[in-house]
Amino acid sequence: MMGGNMSKMMKQVQKMQQDMLRLQEELGNRTVESTAGGGAVKVVANGRNEIVSIEIKPEALDPEDVEMLQDMILAAVNEALKKAQDMISQEMGRLTGNLKIPGLF
């Protein structure tokens, strides 16, 4: 009886691993975006926590205030990465039934 349960559990673990790999690939194709400065800076990140694009509108370019542009870029990047991490956590939670598995994501 114990062997049957162990076999069933191992199959479930293997299925979860396959599902996780599929989800990781899928998340790499999904994106989130964030803006700063009223849309002057837009950053897009994917579900691998990678920044895939940064757009800066011409009106954001002020040679007299480079620091403001740097702050807007930093704010938009950080927010995009946070949104990407939230998306990853939400999707992984669905997959694992909200189990907290250390080091998983």
Swiss-Prot record:
This is Nucleoid-associated protein PTH_0052. Binds to DNA and alters its conformation. May be involved in regulation of gene expression, nucleoid organization and DNA protection. The lineage of its organism: Bacteria, Bacillati, Bacillota, Clostridia, Eubacteriales. Belongs to the YbaB/EbfC family. InterPro entries: YbaB-like_sf, YbaB/EbfC. Keywords: Cytoplasm, DNA-binding. Its main location: cytoplasm. One of its GO terms (cellular component) is bacterial nucleoid. Homodimer. Coiled coil: none annotated.
